[in-house]
Amino acid sequence: MFLRDLMHLVCAGLLGCALSGAAISADLREIRDRGELRHLGIRYANFVTGSGDGFDVELIQGFAKHIGVTYRFIQTDFYTAIRDLLGQNVVRRGDEVALEGAFPVRGDLIASGFTVLPWREKVLLYSAPTFPSQVLLVARAESPRKPIKGSHDINADIAETKAQIGRSSLLVMERTCLDPANYGLKGKGIDLRAYTKSTNLNERVPALLNGDAEFTLLDVPDAILDLQKWTGKIKIIGPVSDEQHLAVAFPKSSPELRRAFNEYLGQIRSDGRYDALVQKYYPGIRRYFPSFFSSGG
């Protein structure tokens, strides 16, 4: 009996040592006990500017105050953000998603223009939508490809846009919200060129202008900024997706943290703080998504 009990203790100790290298995801109570909310953010468009501010930075700073804790920003990227949140790598095999490995948990939530995608929903909890988006096909201004005229049928518009690519080259960043696999662009004869010089999605337009490919993909919030920054140098061909939603991502083990965030989001939508953030970081975007902003998401 003593030997069996001793072995149980040894096994439990070994398990504890194994888990100590990878912090456990925390829910609301643990975060309040700790006194700090760790925001995993990715430098992207005006969601996280890299200068200490951004739509999602201020959004989560307000949430930290709402739940009575301090705020800490932790920089990550689209390739490691989920691992930094869950302590495991996400491996996609077709429609199946698996979690593998054991890594330190670095943050409590992801907020950085993070798109709600079906495969991500298998391993994450998402908040209520925080922002609208849509993925667009973009070319250099001198490209012979013409922007589609557009119609009231989004599926027809998407098909017409994709047809413009043909077998041309498309600059892509796999395993991000702009992965061509998410939009039926793999296995279609397109010359897919992976951008691997950096994990920064903001570098795709400079690469496009440098001639790395004939097309690339942008989402609407990023495209609005790039059309201003690169005036007269790029053009939108058309959509490759329907309207999408961006949201804050939480571990499956943090339902109370998500509930508290949704409560906070509802409050700031009602009292005008949300609208002020939209106007500060994305003025003019309401005309692209009038139904989202008029309906409260």
Model-assigned labels for residue ranges:
Residues 8-20:
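Bacterial N-terminal signal peptides
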Residues 57, 61, 65, 70-159, ...:
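Acidic, polar ligand-binding/catalytic clefts
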Residues 27-55:
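Short glycine-rich His-centered loop
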Residues 97-121, 181-185, 206-242:
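A ligand-binding cleft/hinge motif common to bilobed small-molecule-binding domains
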Residues 57-66, 139-169, 245-285:
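Extended ligand-binding regions for polar small-molecule ligands
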Residues 64-77, 164-167, 185-199, 212:
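A local structural motif
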Residues 42-43, 130-138, 144-145, 203, ...:
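Periplasmic-binding protein-like
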Residues 22-25:
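Boundary at the C-terminal end of the N-terminal hydrophobic targeting segment
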